[in-house]
């Protein structure tokens, strides 16, 4: 299998630990081990953890805690993985073969599209649409376009909900209609829900799980839970599909890490899960207003307010390519952003705002200093939020 370069991951891997301000990150400021394992009992159990192979599908206790987040879920519906990225990877390796038609929501985290192309599938894009018709700007699904794309040859429809990079979330009505469209042709739906729980208004995004038989949900602790270093993810699927995916997992990473398993069980106890999500939402509510004010001060910028996740997709009118803009901001001011080119959306950049609030404002000012040097046309009142 020949894989194309994953441009965003390569950018972040090369630069995120070298710049002074990282606004390319889509999660929130991570916790320390001492913040997660607060009790003496948790710390004692952590230090006593044998460093052998854990259960390769993840510990039973973690299965139970994962499944409780999904309607009618049980331990048999869960496969624990090394991050949400492995959950996506083994799902594609199981479902997709050469010549299959797959539909990928765009814009999106480009892992799914890259893997599908590497597997020699026929990849069709299904774009979210900027819509202000209701008076409240949002990125919405184009269901008519999806109906036109899905055929009897469609193997799977891949969603990211809440969406990366827009921060949009789909409504329950939209999810049900997507299921109806898929059901007419027997297509699978794979829903990456790793930002679920990181909603700015505190209302949890509805899950795709339980709406249709051929659904696989992927998720993990990296984004909403601020625990990317644990590299713990999971997928939710019908039990027979979980068994098949376990077989693929045998060929990838075999098992999660024992220490990560232990800390994930701590993180997903009901009380601790509530605390972690409240912390994330608190950071988002503190930081997003500063981002919004920064955009509003600049007539050449506009955005649709994000609903979930520590990210927003900013449109700019400046006469510069998005990758060149990113490089100038990085090289001149040591701030990292994600260019719209990485989502096939030149004229935009993705801005992460989940960092320490004391770092966010100076980072934004540095981005602004570069933008101020670049020619931008006079921009009339935008239809987007300012």
Feature locations, PLM:
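N-terminal small-domain helix-loop-helix segment of the aminotransferase-like
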Residues: 1-83, 90, 270, 373-374
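PLP-dependent enzyme catalytic core of the Aspartate aminotransferase-like
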Residues: 72, 103, 147-148, 319, ...
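Conserved glycine-rich beta-strand-loop-beta hairpin in the small C-terminal domain of fold type I
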Residues: 265, 281-291, 303-316
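Phosphate-binding glycine-rich loop
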Residues: 60-101, 105-108, 220, 319, ...
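Helix C-cap/helix->beta junction micro-motif
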Residues: 119, 184-185, 298, 333, ...
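PLP-dependent aspartate aminotransferase-fold enzymes
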Residues: 92-138
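Active-site phosphate-binding strand-loop segment of PLP-dependent enzymes
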Residues: 129-203
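Conserved core segment of the aminotransferase class I/II
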Residues: 211-285, 292-293, 365, 376
């Amino acid at each position: 299998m020949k894989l194309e370069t994953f441009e965003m991951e390569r950018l972040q891997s090369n630069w995120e630990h070298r710049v002074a301000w990282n606004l390319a990150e889509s999660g929130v400021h991570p916790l320390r081990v001492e913040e997660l394992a607060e009790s003496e009992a948790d710390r004692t159990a952590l230090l006593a953890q044998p460093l052998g192979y854990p259960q390769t599908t993840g510990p039973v206790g973690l299965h139970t805690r994962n499944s409780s987040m999904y309607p009618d879920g049980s331990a048999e519906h869960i496969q624990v993985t090394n991050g949400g990225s492995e959950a996506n990877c083994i799902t594609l390796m199981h479902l997709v073969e050469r010549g299959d038609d797959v539909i990928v929501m765009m814009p999106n985290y480009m892992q799914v599209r890259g893997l599908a192309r590497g597997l020699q599938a026929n990849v069709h894009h299904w774009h979210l649409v900027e819509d202000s018709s209701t008076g409240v700007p949002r990125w919405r699904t184009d269901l008519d376009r999806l109906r036109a794309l899905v055929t009897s040859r469609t193997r799977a429809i891949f969603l990211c909900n809440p969406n990366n990079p827009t921060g949009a979330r789909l409504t329950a009505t939209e999810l049900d209609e997507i299921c109806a469209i898929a059901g007419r042709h027997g297509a699978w739906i794979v829903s990456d829900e790793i930002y679920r729980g990181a909603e700015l208004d505190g209302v949890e995004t509805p899950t795709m799980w339980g709406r249709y038989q051929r659904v696989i949900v992927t998720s993990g602790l990296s984004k909403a839970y601020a625990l990317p270093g644990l590299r713990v993810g999971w997928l939710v699927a019908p039990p027979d599909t979980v068994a098949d995916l376990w077989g693929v997992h045998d060929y990838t990473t075999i098992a999660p890490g024992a220490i990560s398993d232990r800390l994930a069980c701590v993180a997903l106890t009901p009380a601790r899960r509530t605390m972690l999500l409240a912390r994330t939402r608190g950071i988002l509510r503190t930081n997003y207003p500063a981002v919004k004010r920064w955009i509003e001060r600049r007539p050449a910028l506009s955005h649709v307010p994000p609903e979930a996740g520590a990210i927003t997709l900013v449109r700019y009118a400046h006469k510069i390519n998005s990758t060149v803009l990113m490089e100038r901001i990085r090289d001149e001011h040591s701030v990292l952003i994600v260019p719209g080119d990485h989502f096939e959306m030149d004229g935009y950049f993705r801005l992460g705002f989940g960092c320490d609030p004391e770092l966010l404002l100076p980072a934004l000012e540095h981005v602004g200093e570069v933008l101020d040097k670049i020619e931008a046309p006079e921009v009339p009142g935008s239809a987007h939020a300012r």
